[in-house]
């Protein structure tokens, strides 16, 4: 009896709680295919090519930006068409993301990444991009983009 109790105590003492489960990183090929429309949209931003942006997004999607504005609220919503209409060729706009976190579940994906925007080679603003994407007929497209934006504390300022 004493041996059974001792064995039970030792077994309980040696048991450890498992760490929380974390998702496995997506296979490299899946990550690359999810990032492809994002990279294409950034290239279209740089070229000021609104039609190219619209080829990689769902028209019913939205762009939502947060950040402090002089006028008060920093929350802005636009359709992809409204957002793309603001692009101008040759304005020197360049956006880069780094260290994207990519989550994929079937035909839905999410990309979260810090970004820096340069205009004419100078840092303009930075923040975080959150893209949600949907795959239809084997093609990933961006449904929505939500991003934060600040002008201070940006890398390389």
Task: Name each model feature, range by range.
Residues 110, 126-153:
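Short beta-strand edge/turn micro-motifs at domain boundaries
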Residues 52, 62-64, 110, 141:
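General beta-strand recognition
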Residues 2-14:
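Bacterial N-terminal signal peptides
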Residues 18, 74-124:
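Surface-exposed, charged secondary-structure patches
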Residues 48, 58, 97, 106-108, ...:
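Extracytoplasmic
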């Amino acid at each position: 009896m004493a041996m059974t109790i001792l064995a039970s105590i030792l077994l309980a003492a040696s048991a450890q709680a498992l760490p929380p489960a974390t998702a496995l990183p997506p296979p490299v090929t899946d990550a690359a295919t999810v990032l492809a429309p994002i990279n294409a949209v950034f290239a279209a931003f740089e070229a000021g090519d609104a039609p190219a942006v619209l080829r990689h997004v769902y028209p019913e999607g939205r762009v939502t930006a947060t950040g402090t504005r002089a006028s008060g609220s920093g929350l802005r919503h636009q359709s992809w068409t409204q957002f793309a209409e603001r692009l101008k060729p040759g304005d020197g706009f360049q956006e880069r993301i780094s260290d994207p976190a990519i989550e994929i579940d079937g035909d839905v994906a999410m990309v979260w990444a810090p970004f820096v925007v340069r205009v004419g080679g100078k840092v303009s603003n930075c923040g975080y991009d959150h893209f949600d994407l949907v795959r239809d007929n084997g093609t990933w497209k961006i449904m929505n983009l939500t991003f934060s934006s600040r002008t201070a504390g940006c890398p390389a300022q």
